[in-house]
């Protein structure tokens, strides 16, 4: 008689938890990065919603002039924002327990720091989770690399720029009009439109939109016909089919004749690498530009570059931009300082007879 003994697998609770976290069979993959991503993004989202609706005014400039940002304090969806942490706090870590009371924490803009730091940690973990899922499925890692562009951009405006300027009050407000205000002030103080890295970012975003539209329309227009001419070509396609849907040779021929031969890709991998790399590299450069301007390495200054034989300035477009910058600079934080830095840095004339 033969006795077969089956050894029972005794999986601990921790082991089952690990298997569940790293399982690719779940409807939504969690992963170890997800263990940190889920609570941080939930915290950032929850506090953002509550603060956007009900946060009291914040003393953003540290001069006892609170600015209202929430819906219950008179704003709408367009004008509302999470007001950045007060200049009185600077770059100090300012959790709730560091304040004397919750009222003080709210008055000094504590929710902004809480939201931003949790959000940045969350999106960084989302990027790591993309890599983790790719790794478990045996895929290449480029999805996470592409996502690093918006992560870098968010890190630049929410963390690097405040560090360079010395205060979280200089970070980008979390709202529509607050974003526009940040952009206008950034142009006034750093002349970002004249920074080559910003120009590369504009080329990346607009070029990426153009290439995406061109690619999508070209593929949709060169479907492989599986039907008669009496019914739609779309009827010949079934979602998830293994066969190729469109004819890249036909698309290449069309585009090559529309512009010229070498403007068209005949290799699908090269084409899709280009479509991914163009906007990603552009946004990388923009994030790098914000990070350098954070430490006041600003855009090009061509003010008063052209003069006539008598030394009189002939205004160029750079001088028009400079005048606009000065106008924007004197208008923002109008109660925090009497003159923009450009004017205040000039030595005052002596008044002692």
Swiss-Prot record:
Please report the organism this UniProt entry assigns to the protein. Acorus calamus
Q: Does the keyword Transport apply?
A: yes
* Broad EC category: oxidoreductase
According to UniProt, the name of this protein is Photosystem II protein D1
- Taxonomic lineage from the root: Eukaryota, Viridiplantae, Streptophyta, Embryophyta, Tracheophyta
Family that this chain belongs to = Belongs to the reaction center PufL/M/PsbA/D family.
Maturation propeptide residues:
345-353
Binding of Fe cation occurs at 215, 272
Site (described: Cleavage):
344-345
Tell me where in this chain the PTM N-acetylthreonine is found. 2
Topology of this chain in the membrane = Multi-pass membrane protein
EC numbers listed for it are 1.10.3.9
Database matches in PANTHER family: PHOTOSYSTEM II D2 PROTEIN, PHOTOSYSTEM II PROTEIN D1
User: Which GO terms of the molecular function aspect are on file?
Assistant: chlorophyll binding; electron transporter, transferring electrons within the cyclic electron transport pathway of photosynthesis activity; iron ion binding; oxidoreductase activity, acting on diphenols and related substances as donors, oxygen as acceptor; oxygen evolving activity
Any Pfam family matching the protein: Photo_RC
């Amino acid at each position: 008689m033969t006795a077969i003994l089956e050894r029972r697998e005794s999986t601990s609770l921790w082991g089952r938890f690990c298997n569940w976290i790293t399982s690719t069979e779940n409807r939504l993959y969690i992963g170890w990065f997800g263990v940190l991503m889920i609570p941080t993004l939930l915290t950032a989202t929850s506090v953002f919603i509550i603060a956007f609706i009900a946060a009291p005014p914040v003393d953003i400039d540290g001069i006892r002039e609170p600015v209202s940002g929430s819906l219950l304090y008179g704003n709408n969806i367009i004008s509302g924002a999470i007001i950045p942490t007060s200049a009185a706090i600077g770059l100090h870590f300012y959790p709730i327990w560091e304040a004397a009371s919750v009222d003080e924490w709210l008055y000094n803009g504590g929710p902004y720091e809480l939201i931003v730091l949790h959000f940045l940690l969350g999106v960084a973990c989302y990027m790591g989770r993309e890599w983790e899922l790719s790794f478990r499925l045996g895929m290449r890692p480029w999805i996470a690399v592409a996502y690093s562009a918006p992560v870098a951009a968010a890190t630049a405006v929410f963390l690097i720029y405040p560090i360079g300027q010395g205060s979280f009050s200089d970070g980008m407000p979390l709202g529509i009009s607050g974003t526009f205000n940040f952009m206008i002030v950034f142009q006034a103080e750093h002349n970002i439109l004249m920074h080559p890295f910003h120009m590369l970012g504009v080329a990346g975003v607009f070029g990426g939109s153009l290439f995406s539209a061109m690619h999508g329309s070209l593929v949709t227009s060169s479907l492989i016909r599986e039907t008669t001419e009496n019914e739609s070509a779309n009827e010949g396609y079934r979602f998830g089919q293994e066969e190729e849907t469109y004819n890249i040779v036909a698309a290449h021929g069309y585009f090559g004749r529309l512009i010229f031969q070498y403007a068209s890709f005949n290799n699908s991998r090269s084409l899709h690498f280009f479509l991914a790399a163009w906007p990603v590299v552009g946004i990388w450069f923009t994030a790098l530009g914000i990070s350098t301007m954070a430490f006041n390495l600003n855009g090009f200054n061509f003010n008063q570059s052209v003069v006539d034989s008598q030394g009189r300035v002939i205004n160029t477009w750079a001088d028009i931009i400079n005048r606009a910058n000065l106008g924007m600079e004197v208008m923002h934080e109008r109660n925090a300082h009497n003159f923009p830095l450009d004017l205040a840095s000039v030595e005052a004339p002596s008044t002692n007879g």
